[in-house]
Amino acid sequence: MTNNSSFISSESYLNLYSALGLIFSIIGFLTLFDAEQQKNLLAEGGLFESLTVYLYIFCLILICVKWPWQKILSNWYLSALIILFALRELDYDKAHFTHGVLKSRQYFSDLVSLPELLISIVVLIFILTILALIVLKERNNFIKGVVNLRQSQLAILASIILVIITKTIDGMERKFGIDLSPAGERFALIIEEVGEMGIPIMFAIAILSWRNKNQT
């Protein structure tokens, strides 16, 4: 039993390392393309944005296939979070709102009608509820898993780091008053788009790692 557990753990770590290696390799590979090719690949609705959305859908499929229904229902907020990430990638938070449901201007602007404001508040409350449930119910397991170097929690930690990095890079010049060269802007965009694609990859590893752990 112990040997089997060690084998599965090592195999899962290999998956995690391979995924991280893939992300860094894609970043390095994209720097070899010229500016026009990079622009086409990284454009809104382009290859990498589409792949990111498909990967979130793949995560939902993995949950349905690999997890028992009891876990799916009791941890419904995890599936909801993945759906929210997919909708965010498709810019649904901006497409149907004047300023964007995640922007403070949405709740104080005179341009926002009362019905839209009420819908925005409901959506925001739902998002905050999902995040609160995850923090309250998964916090202890997450911390213990990271301390014990469990593959599923390490994958989630990697996804959190990717979220922080990509959100920091997004609008970096505006946020921090940094002037980037055209080459610097393209490299930042590469990191942002590939990093965003890496988030559902890490989610998928976490989902599969949970299943592997319970098969031992």
PLM feature spans:
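Short aromatic-rich membrane-water interface segments that cap or initiate transmembrane helices
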Residues: 42-50, 105-121, 183-196
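C-terminal transmembrane-bundle signature of multipass membrane proteins
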Residues: 163-179, 189-216
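Alpha-helical transmembrane segments
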Residues: 11-29, 77-79, 157-161
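Juxtamembrane "helix-exit" motif on the non-cytosolic side of transmembrane helices
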Residues: 29-40, 136-139, 168-180
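Membrane-proximal helix-loop-helix units in multi-pass membrane proteins
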Residues: 90-147
